Design a protein with these regions (language model features):
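Short acidic/polar hinge/loop motifs at secondary-structure boundaries
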Residues: 118-147
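Acidic/polar loop-and-plug regions of large Gram-negative outer-membrane beta-barrel proteins
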Residues: 230, 234-236, 241-308, 331-375, ...
Length: 748
């Protein structure tokens, strides 16, 4: 791998400094172990001590989440080593990349789970990735993030990143938090959570939020609105427990898209969406007019509900069954650029000027305009998953056997394209005097579909662990999965099915690992695995010709890991060297265009470090150094994978102190990222950038907390992506501009 040598000195320096500091901790650290339990990556989710886990997993608790102040679920994933997140599109619609795995957008190698169950079995559909249907609030107690490891064998078989969000639980004590948050962009948000005991051994937790704002990029109207309500009930039994929950969400926000990078005044605060253009009329199918409100943006209106049963049976057997039902609408409305900025005189019918269709303003020929597509995607989704497992511990052997089943459906109605010219300014209006603006066909291409799809997955898996010596543990896992898809699509909204799919495939995934304990608080692990990303509905639509030619559209993922771990009294340090190969990756730049079929490789190392001192100082560091390469491609062999940074680093120091008799914490985050290529051709360079965040927490009285948090303090104008639909257009999507939030909360 070509670039890895350039970063080896950085990686070596980080490893040397952090590991030396870790080893230097006193003997007390070896007696006081951090009993952090992780359930991700374990058969049936029984759980294992983090120090004993032979894989890379990161835990982020509610206290850390509060300090990170993420703007979305995907934004929180930036704190996970090995993960590159583009969260600049708003609360929904993030792009998440895992350890150099290829991707052109969305999050094909991310699974979001709640209480151990996937919220939606398909990691990504067009215009939908898992984080889009999950909202953070005060009901979350912990997030686990497992990369690689045994992932291909358990749960939905995700070979990349599985995040598991755990809900807060009730106890014998009644506890609660009420929190109000506002901001410099007009955010009004109220969070609440309450937990306690309903009766003997029956516990509850209820909570949620209500929010409204005009958006970090001010649209001039309430472009972000939402509410969520969660109930979590737990009944403790003599030999186990029963847990049920439901999470009801209705939350939408503006969809932020690439903007011209070569026009003055268009920066990180800019959004084309506004009062003068949120309403539009488009024509779909047989020239049927449709009135739309682009202000609805992207969102989720639905529920994620489920539960689990955990039992300790006779003869040392354990039983666990986890289930989940997800239903709702994940719609998308947006103003999507259809090319770069142009001068009005070059597109006006008279070659001189044009009139605003809303205000009647006459715009001169030197006014910048841009063709904008009015895109509509209506998506109804539903899924049901069940993961049942039996396990037993013998003298030196642990065995688990499980069966995972999933039923997944999606019904889509799209109208893409519908382009018209708008004045290039915040909230800029459409123009009269440009012929294509009023034509049924619009000013560019159009793509309309009506589709329905159902998928079924049935997998049998087993994991076996053998303690060869007091220090050495070996494990193996196998998974046999059958995946079926039935899908049809009408691509012209004329009632004729152009593409129909009746698909079935079976694959066997595996993992082999070894964990060696160097000391009670220190160890190393090694692992290899092979897994698969099975195709879902849009994979067939995008690659229908390839599918008809006999390609099963399955991405084959092979990984190897070598890791070091240390967990002392006040220091945690994890370093993981990873290597992976992904065969059969497909990339479609725009619906209707031919697919590119690629093989990608990545080699890298990730660091996860936490230090806490009795003086009140704490530091978290996560860093990733990686080299990616396209090893098989018709045109791009030898290039780097698009949108993948060679290195990134994130440092979060925090200091607790007394301020005028009050407990206080000052904290901040410095993050930096390397240059990236915006396309697989490596012709578009996205420059690296640095970002600073700063926050202060003050507790003037018991239970009362005041917090102020500044994001992007220096107002860095970083770019996360170019224009993936038109790489030649000088467009790009900025990171979010500087914003400041203030909250006051009371806990009891």
């Amino acid at each position: 791998m070509r670039k890895l040598k350039q970063y080896s000195l950085l990686a070596t320096a980080i490893a040397a400094v952090l590991s030396n500091q870790a080893i230097a901790q006193d003997e007390q650290a070896k007696e006081q172990k951090v009993e952090t339990i992780v359930v991700s990556g374990t058969a049936g989710g029984r759980g294992i001590r983090k120090i004993d886990a032979g894989f890379a997993v990161t835990n982020i608790d509610a206290v850390k989440i509060d300090k990170l102040a993420p703007k979305s679920t995907a934004d929180l994933l930036k704190a996970v080593p090995g993960i590159w997140v583009e969260s600049s599109g708003g609360e929904s619609g993030a792009n998440v990349f895992v350890r150099g795995f290829p991707g052109g957008g969305d999050a094909p190698f991310l699974t979001v789970s709640l209480q151990g169950s996937p919220v939606y079995p398909a990691p990504t559909l067009s215009f939908l990735e898992n984080s889009s249907i999950f909202r953070l609030d005060e009901t979350i107690s912990m997030m686990e993030a497992l990369r690689g490891g045994p992932n291909p064998v358990v749960s939905n078989g995700q070979p990349g990143l599985t995040t598991n969000f755990q809900l807060k639980r009730g106890s014998e004590d009644t506890e609660g938090t009420f929190k109000y948050t506002t901001s410099d962009y007009g955010l009004q948000r109220l969070d609440a959570v309450l937990s306690g005991e309903l009766s003997d051994d029956l516990y509850y937790m209820v909570g949620g939020y209500i929010k409204r704002s005009s958006g970090i990029r001010d649209a001039g109207f309430t472009s972000e609105r939402g509410q969520q309500f969660t109930i979590n009930l737990t009944k403790e039994l003599d030999n186990g427990e029963i847990n049920v929950y439901t999470r009801q969400t209705d939350d939408t926000g503006a969809w932020y898209l690439p903007t011209p990078l070569n026009v003055d005044g268009v920066d990180a605060e800019y959004t084309q969406l506004g009062t003068h253009n949120r309403q539009a009329v488009i024509y779909a199918g047989n020239n049927n007019a449709m009135e739309i409100d682009l202000g609805e943006g992207r969102g989720w209106k639905g529920h994620i509900s489920g539960g689990s049963i955990k039992l300790e049976l006779k003869n040392g057997w354990h039983f666990i069954d986890r289930f989940n039902l997800t239903q709702g609408e994940a719609n998308t409305y947006g103003l999507v650029p259809a090319g770069g900025a142009e001068l009005l005189k070059d597109v006006a019918d008279n070659g001189q000027d044009a009139k605003g269709s809303v205000t009647g303003t006459i715009y001169e020929g030197d006014t910048y305009v841009q063709s904008m597509g009015r895109w509509v995607v209506l998506k109804d989704i539903e899924s049901f998953t069940n993961d049942l497992a039996f396990s037993k511990s013998f003298d030196k052997w642990e065995s688990a056997y499980g069966v995972y089943s999933a039923s997944t459906s999606a019904q889509d109605w799209w109208s893409l394209g519908n382009a018209a010219y708008y004045v290039l300014e915040a909230g800029g209006e459409m123009l009269d005097g440009i012929e294509c603006n009023t034509s049924v066909e619009g000013c560019a291409w159009n793509y309309d579909i009506n589709s329905t799809g159902d998928a079924k997955t049935l997998a049998f898996y087993t994991t076996q662990s053998y303690r060869a010596t007091d220090a050495l543990t070996l494990d193996i896992g196998l998974r046999s999965e059958r995946h079926e898809v039935n899908y049809s699509v009408d691509e012209n909204l004329n009632g004729i099915i152009e593409k129909s799919v009746d698909y079935s495939a079976r694959k066997t995934s595996w993992t082999i690992g070894a964990d060696y304990k160097l000391a009670d608080d220190m160890g190393v692990f090694a692992r290899i695995n092979k897994g698969y990303k099975m195709p879902y509905f849009d994979d067939f639509r995008d690659n229908y010709g390839t599918y008809e030619a006999g390609n099963p559209l399955i991405k084959e993922v092979t990984q190897a890991e070598l890791g070091y771990k240390y967990m002392g009294d006040n220091t945690d340090f994890f370093a993981t060297l990873f290597s992976n190969e992904v065969k059969g990756d497909t990339f479609v730049r725009r619906p209707g265009e031919p697919a590119e079929i690629l093989t990608n490789e990545a080699l890298g190392i990730e660091f996860d470090y936490n230090y806490n001192h009795e003086s009140g100082l704490s530091v978290n560091l996560n860093a990733t150094v990686q080299d990616t390469e396209i090893t098989e491609s018709p045109d791009n062999e030898g290039n780097e994978s698009q949108r993948q940074p060679g290195w990134q680093i994130r440092v979060t120091p925090s200091y607790d102190f007394e301020l005028a008799g009050m407990f206080a914490t000052i904290y901040g985050t410095f993050s930096a990222v390397d240059d990236r290529y915006g396309n697989n051709e490596n012709t578009v360079v996205l420059e690296g950038y640095e970002k600073f965040d700063l926050g202060l927490i003050v507790e003037p009285a018991e239970g009362l907390k005041l917090q102020i948090a500044a994001d992007n303090l220096t107002d860095e104008q970083g770019i996360t992506e170019g224009d993936p639909r038109n790489v030649d257009a000088p467009n790009g999507r900025y990171i979010m501009p500087r914003s400041i939030k203030f909250s006051v909360s009371y806990s009891f």
